[in-house]
Amino acid sequence: TIGVPFFWPSAAMPNTVIDSWSGMVFLKFNGAKFSASDYPVLAKVFPSLVLPEARGDFIRIWDDGRGADGGRELLSWQAATNFSQFAGNIGEGAGHAINFHDGIAGNQPGFSRFNFTSNSVGDGVNFVAVRPRNIAFNFLVRAK
């Protein structure tokens, strides 16, 4: 269906792989502009005439008022966050807390607290980058 995003497991476009799709046109979600006169149905789905830049990013389902990721608009981009903890003086042992709130109050959905055990002593702020396991696919849309 024109305008519906989908994942594709090949660098080759679907119309070059599947004979029955040879008359179709597919575009990547790579931030490119497109023409409403060339792709009028796609222009109804993406009236900005620009496909979102999604290369290397994870898709997140829209919050739509739930409160777990409040204030987000559809197709908006969001930077990564880090787990962080201020460590005025961390001693060895268990029970150190990392608060991961991403701007969310402690009594709201989405606020999390993680405990960890330290094997060393130190000062400052520790940051840990987190990336879930993943697999790379092409992210495409049928344009015609």
What are these regions (language model features)?
Residues 1-144:
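Low-complexity Ser/Thr/Gly/Asn-rich repetitive segments
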